[in-house]
Amino acid sequence: MSDLAVTGNVESHVTDPHRRKDFLDPTEMKAFLEAAKAGRQGVRDHLLFLMMYRHGLRCSEAVDLRIEDVSFDRATLWVKRLKGSNSGTHPIEGDELRAIRRYLGLRKDNLPWLFLSERQGRLSRFAINYLVDRTAEAAGLTNLHPHCLRHSCGYALADRGVDLRTIQEWLGHRSIEMTVRYTRISQRRFNGLWRG
């Protein structure tokens, strides 16, 4: 995996096993994405979760994606944000682009939606909730929710040292205050600040 590779050391803030996780650390994310491949619609599910993670998509933004939002020539994705957030164009990494091509190559329809249900309709938010639960269980993870993938994106970017303004734009936040939460990460960021 290249962009937003699942490497690094993000500390989990979850101590109560019954509390829903805010985000997945890199090891958990890798296990989650691998588990997604094993389902009946593994190609679709892996791509869905990879895109939700890398682009910080909400459920409703993921189900609203259309094939025309992907530019294969420019290797970009048009992300239409909801809830008054700022929309924008995101680059798509090579492995993600190949996964999109592979998934579309398996389809035999002319429907505009990027993600389809097994009944050939647009995938629903309810279906994504179910898929997250099933995939989490297969990966040995508990108390996940789809929004956890969006949070995981923010935390992963912050852990890589990406500045807050860039994370704000990537996630489409209107206010920087919404983005600040992602700086609550490992103390590793502070190592060596005064060495020199």
Regions found by a protein language model. Name each.
Residues 1-196:
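Conserved catalytic core of the tyrosine transesterase superfamily
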